[in-house]
Amino acid sequence: MTQRIILHIDFDYFYAQCEEVRTPALKTKPVAVCMFSDRGGDSGAIATANYTAREFGVKSGLSIQSAKQKLKNRTDSAFLPADFEYYSEMSEKSMSIIKKFADVFEYVGRDEAYLDVSEKVEHDFVKASHIAQQIKNEVREKTNLTCSVGISPNKLLSKIASGYKKPDGLTIVTPDKISEFMETLNLEDIHGVGKKTVQKLAEEGIETISQAKNLDIFVLISMFGRKTGTYIHNAVRGIDDEAVKIRASMLQLSKIMTLKEDSVDYTFLEKTCLNYVKNCIPLLLMRIKCLDQLGYISHKLIFLVKQNLRC
């Protein structure tokens, strides 16, 4: 079988980095991009933070109040409201540069993409590394953004590799180095292996990649079911046959609502969410109609309700 070569591009602390590009003076300061809620004040959560802020424990998902507490001694800290229109513009500019290097380009999100470059580089990892560096250089030159790149024979390994030497990293995992590379990882480093899975394995005395590799596939299937068990069996060996699929960027419309007060009353929450969705539908349909007239094609209408209960 001809060797595939897959690149995973991952922009470093993307939202915060975009803000640094817009305002270069922020580069030496702790920067946190915030999702402010409807409650006003410091209610809301951190979307992302630059590495200076991360040194103080500020990370995605942390409440804004907690983040400000961690940075209380840094009077130069910047807490900025998320500007998704600007981030999308920066993403589109970057992705237009990146996709021209691919045989097959798969858009994952504003800050992430897969490229199959197998044919373009004639299945040569050295040539692939040159393309990766070319991508990094051109993106930096035209957008002032840095990105990290992982190169390997499959999507799973490339995604792990892109996060290996952040920020502004480039990591190559050739077929003969897969086993060695996997031994440097923790189980939770594998995409798709979450905390609950790691905990369940730990309960059986399985805490390392090596130990997981020694488990019979049928044991894993009995623990997690056929799909997940098979995935874990393959993933700890660096095996992934999923193809890079042509997927362009999508325009997503979203609206976030935060309750005025925290609640664990499911009847109240259900009623509130249903009323909110009913009120959103006419506006959303109107916006979709306008976008259709501009040439966008509507594929799906999905309502996703996330709950964050704190007891």
Which residues does each PLM region occupy?
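Residues that scaffold, gate, or flank divalent-cation-dependent active/transport sites
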Residues: 1-110, 114
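A residue-level signal for conserved active-site and pocket-lining positions in enzyme catalytic cores
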Residues: 10, 57, 67, 111, ...
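Short acidic, glycine/serine/threonine-rich loops at helix termini
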Residues: 18-20, 44-47, 157-165, 243-248
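Compact, charge-rich alpha-helical regulatory domains located at protein termini
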Residues: 22, 72, 162-241
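Short Gly/Ser/Thr- and Asp/Glu-enriched loop/turn motifs at secondary-structure junctions
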Residues: 108-112, 152-155, 289-293
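Catalytic palm subdomain of template-directed nucleic-acid polymerases
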Residues: 115-133, 205
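Long, highly charged, low-complexity intrinsically disordered interaction regions
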Residues: 127-185
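DNA-contacting surface of Y-family translesion DNA polymerases
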Residues: 202-311
